[in-house]
Amino acid sequence: MSVWDSIVGQQQVVEQLKAIASGDPKAIAQSWLICGPPGSGRSNVARAFAAALESPDHGLGDEPTKAAQQVLAGTHPDVTVLATNKVTIGIDEVRNIITTSEQMPSTAPWRIIIIEDVDRMLERTTNVLLKEIEEPSGHTIWLLCAPSRKSRCVPHVLRKGISASRACMRRMSR
């Protein structure tokens, strides 16, 4: 069972992420926006990508490594997931996750932060996160999950003058 087995119907995305995870670590973008409607598996994609990034075999093996198994099980010490059942993600939760993001990874090459439903942040909360996304620590990768590129969080993340679809294409081409 590969780290990618839970991703159904997204073979092109899986192939791109495999290539990125196994490529030059210096060329990996440190902030990602993973979009898809509720139930589409965007959180599964984020976890699989995190598992591949933290795994010595980069997620290319037929069986997940111990590190990949830990990421997929939610027990890896260098991968933190912020998920909420509340209506909004609070500013204190984001401040705590920023503090975590600044710590050096303990066992793996990256400190990976996954934020599910990033569109649940209010504008002031998004502004707190913005600096970290724009200038992440050299050892941190942010995986942000949202139901669409045009969610209310994106205008704060994208640079002025660049459409959401163009920014996503630009990110994928790197």
Q: What is each PLM-predicted segment?
A:
Residues 116-117, 144-149, 167:
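A short beta-strand-to-loop transition that corresponds to the Sensor-1 phosphate-sensing loop
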Residues 28-29, 75-78, 108-110, 136-140, ...:
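Short glycine-/polar-rich loops that comprise or flank the Walker A/P-loop
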